[in-house]
A protein has these predicted regions:
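C-terminal low-complexity, Ser/Thr- and acidic/Pro-rich disordered "stalk" regions positioned immediately N-terminal
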Residues: 505-548
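Conserved N-terminal submotifs of small, disulfide-stabilized extracellular modules
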Residues: 432-455, 505-507
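Conserved "repeat-terminator" motif of extracellular CCP/Sushi domains
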Residues: 433-438, 486-509
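Short coil/turn motif common to extracellular beta-sandwich-like domains
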Residues: 342-346, 433-434, 455-461
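Surface-exposed interfaces of beta-sheet-rich extracellular modules
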Residues: 459-487
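Cell-envelope and extracellular/periplasmic
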Residues: 1-431
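A cross-kingdom C-terminal cell-surface attachment/processing module
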Residues: 552-573
Length: 575
C-alpha cells in the first residue's frame, strides 16, 4: 500500500518490521524486501486473520489421511460395521470440495527441527501454502483447513491464515518452556520436557496472530490431572508471551467421543478439566464435542463440524459479532440450575446459553440420577417445560445428584437453537425447596439473567450469594425494586405468583458494555449452590476491528515476520 519501512538486521540476519495498519484485503499485494543491493519479492500477500494452531495428532492430522480413510476399513473390515462416521465422511469431503474461496486461505506448517544438547540447530522454514482448491492441501492440517474455511465464511470472506505447529502423540509438558518445566517437574531428567517448545515454537519467530487453537490431551488422559492443569497454565502464559499478547484468545477443543479399554473412564474426567480450565483462564474458550468423535478411531473425521463450532465461538467472543446465519454460534449450553420440591418426584434443569433447548431424535441418553452418590440410575425420558428448561420424573425416593453425558462414547440428548449440545457435567447437586419453583422462564432476558418464580400461598426465605469478585446490584420482585437486607429476603404467604430477580455486578463497578452477572445462588433450606456465570466477553468484543463488515476506519498496526521463504501478515490486536 505504498509503505516504505527500514530496519537493521541482527548478526544472524534476523529482522522484524512493523507496518502501518491495513484493513483486511483479499486482493493480493506485493511485498519487496531489499538489503545490500539484493531484493526478494513476495507476491499475492493477503491481509487478514492469522491463527496459531498447536497440539498433537488431531491438530497435525492432514487432509490426505481424511481423504483416503478407506485404509482404516481395509485394515479391519469389522471396523466399518459400527463406524457410522465413516459413512458420513463423504458428506464432509463434499463440504471441503464445495468451498469456492480457497484463494482467501493461507497455511504454514512448521517443520520439526533437530536438536543438539537441547539447543535448536538452524533450519530452513517452510513456505506458506497458497491453495487454489482442496487438492492443494493434501498434507495440510485437516483441523486448520476446516477452521479457516468456517471462520472466513462467518466473517464474510475475510482472508484467514493458520500457522500449524503440532506433533502427533505429544504431551503438554513438551510444549512448555524450560523455566516452567523446572517449577512443575523439579529434578526430573525427562528429555522430552520442553522438547516441542524448543524445536516447534522457538524456530518460528514472532508472527502476529489474532488467536490460538489448542487441540491436545489424548496423550495426557492417563496422567495426573493437577499436573496437566499446571502445565496448561504454563503453556498459556508462554504462548501469550511468545506472541506478545498477554490476553491472546485461545480456543481449546474438548476431547470428543472415543472408546478404548486402555483409557476406559478417563476421558470424562479430562473433559471436565478442560472445561474448568477454560472458565479459570481469561479469554480461553472450549469447544464441546460430546456428540462428535468416533467409536474406535481416535482421529475423528467430523472435524469440519468441530471447527464450525470453534469459528462460531470466535465470532461471538473474539470478534463480538452477531450472527443470523445457519450453523453454530457462541458456546455450548450448560446446566445452570437443578432443583426439585421437597418430597416431589420431578426434577427441573435450566440451561444457560440457550434461548430454547431441544431433545435429540429417538431415545434420550446421557442423564442419570442418584440419591446416595453410589449408584446412578439412567433417566429414560424428559419433558420440555420452558424455553430452556426440561424436567423428568424418577422412581428414586429422592434425588441428590445428577450427572450428564459422563461416558467415553455415547449419545448426547439436548441441543440449543444453534445445534450445540449441552456440555457434560459430573455430580451436580440438586437443590431442594419447601416451595414450588416454576420452570418457566420469562423471554427476552439478557444473557445469564435468571428469574425464579414462586407459587401463590408459599412461604420462603431466600439468600442471595454473589460469586467471588461480584457485589449486589439490585433486587426486584414482580418487576418492582425491593431491598435486600444482609443478603436475605423473607417472603411470607405470598398472595400471587411472583418473580424474584437478583442482579450482581463486578466489584468496583462495571462498564456499560458488560452484561450483568446474576444470581449466583438462590436457596431455601439448602446450602450454597454457586452457578457458573457467563464468560466475560473479550476486550475485542466491543472494540473496533479491521475485518470486513465491522464498519471501522481504525487502522491497527500490522507486524511482518520473514523467515526464509515464509511470510505472514496479520492484524495486531488492540490492547
Amino acid at each position: 500500500n505504498g509503505q516504505l519501512k527500514t530496519c537493521t538486521a541482527d548478526e544472524y540476519g534476523r529482522f522484524l518490521v512493523e507496518l502501518d495498519g491495513m484493513r483486511a484485503d483479499a486482493t493480493g499485494k506485493t511485498l519487496t524486501v531489499s538489503a545490500g543491493g539484493a531484493e526478494k519479492r513476495f507476491e499475492n500477500v493477503l491481509i487478514g486473520e492469522v491463527y496459531y494452531g498447536s497440539g498433537q495428532s488431531n491438530m497435525a492430522y492432514p487432509m490426505d489421511e481424511f481423504t483416503y480413510a478407506e485404509s482404516v476399513i481395509e485394515a479391519d473390515p469389522s471396523y466399518g460395521e459400527d463406524y457410522e462416521k465413516y459413512n458420513a465422511r463423504e458428506s464432509y469431503l463434499e463440504a471441503f470440495k464445495d468451498f469456492k474461496n480457497y484463494h482467501l486461505l493461507r497455511f504454514y506448517t512448521q517443520k520439526m527441527l533437530p536438536e543438539t544438547n537441547g539447543v535448536v540447530n538452524k533450519g530452513e522454514c517452510n513456505v506458506w501454502t497458497v491453495p487454489a482448491s482442496v487438492n492443494d492441501l493434501k498434507y495440510t492440517s485437516l483441523t486448520a483447513v476446516a477452521y479457516a474455511i468456517q471462520l472466513s465464511q462467518k466473517l464474510e470472506n475475510v482472508p484467514v491464515g493458520i500457522i500449524v505447529s503440532a506433533v502427533g502423540g505429544s504431551r503438554i509438558h513438551e510444549w512448555i518452556d524450560e523455566k516452567a518445566a523446572a517449577r512443575i517437574f523439579p529434578g526430573n531428567g525427562d528429555s522430552t520436557l520442553s522438547q516441542r517448545y524448543r524445536n516447534m515454537l522457538l524456530p518460528m519467530g514472532s508472527f502476529t496472530v489474532r488467536g490460538a487453537l489448542w487441540y491436545q490431551g489424548e496423550s495426557d488422559v492417563y496422567g495426573d490431572l493437577e499436573t496437566y492443569r499446571l502445565c496448561f497454565k504454563a503453556w498459556l502464559e508462554e504462548t501469550r508471551r511468545f506472541f506478545k499478547d498477554e490476553s491472546l484468545p485461545v480456543i481449546t477443543f474438548q476431547l470428543p467421543q472415543y472408546e478404548d479399554e486402555s483409557c476406559k473412564g478417563l476421558w470424562p474426567a479430562f473433559r471436565q478439566l478442560q472445561e474448568k480450565l477454560a472458565k479459570e483462564c481469561e479469554n480461553v474458550y472450549y469447544v464441546c464435542g460430546i456428540d462428535l468423535g468416533d467409536h474406535r478411531n481416535i482421529h475423528p473425521v467430523d472435524k469440519y463440524e468441530f471447527c464450525e463450532r470453534a469459528a462460531g465461538l470466535a465470532l461471538k467472543y473474539i470478534y463480538g459479532k452477531e450472527y443470523s446465519g445457519e450453523g453454530s454460534y457462541g458456546k455450548n449450553p450448560e446446566v445452570c440450575g437443578l432443583w426439585r420440591k421437597k418430597g416431589g418426584d420431578t426434577v427441573y434443569m435450566r440451561f444457560s446459553d440457550a434461548e430454547k433447548v431441544f431433545l435429540s431424535e429417538g431415545t434420550a441418553y446421557g442423564l442419570s440420577a442418584t440419591s446416595n452418590k453410589q449408584a446412578y440410575v439412567a433417566i429414560p425420558s424428559y419433558r420440555s417445560v420452558g424455553k430452556r428448561t426440561v424436567s423428568f420424573k424418577t422412581k428414586l425416593k429422592y434425588v441428590s445428584y445428577l450427572q450428564e453425558n459422563v461416558f467415553d462414547y455415547g449419545t448426547a440428548f439436548l441441543y440449543n437453537e444453534f445445534g450445540l449440545p449441552v456440555a457434560p457435567f459430573v455430580e451436580r447437586e440438586v437443590q431442594t425447596y419447601d416451595f414450588d419453583v416454576s420452570a418457566e422462564c420469562a423471554g427476552g432476558s439478557v444473557e445469564g439473567d435468571e428469574r425464579f418464580f414462586l407459587s401463590a400461598g408459599s412461604d420462603a426465605s431466600f439468600s442471595f450469594v454473589p460469586k467471588d469478585g461480584y457485589v449486589f446490584k439490585s433486587l426486584s420482585i414482580n418487576g418492582a425494586a425491593a431491598a435486600l437486607d444482609g443478603g436475605r429476603v423473607e417472603l411470607k404467604n405470598v398472595s400471587e405468583d411472583i418473580a424474584v430477580v437478583c442482579v450482581f455486578e463486578k466489584a468496583g463497578g462495571m462498564d456499560s458494555s458488560d452484561q450483568s452477572d446474576v444470581v449466583s445462588s438462590v436457596m431455601g433450606e439448602s446450602d450454597k449452590n454457586s452457578e457458573d456465570s457467563s464468560k466475560e466477553k473479550s476486550d475485542l468484543q466491543n472494540s473496533d476491528s479491521c475485518v470486513k463488515g465491522c464498519g471501522s476506519a481504525l487502522m491497527l498496526p500490522v507486524v511482518l515476520s520473514v523467515c526464509a521463504a515464509g511470510i505472514a501478515l496479520g492484524q495486531k490486536r488492540r490492547k
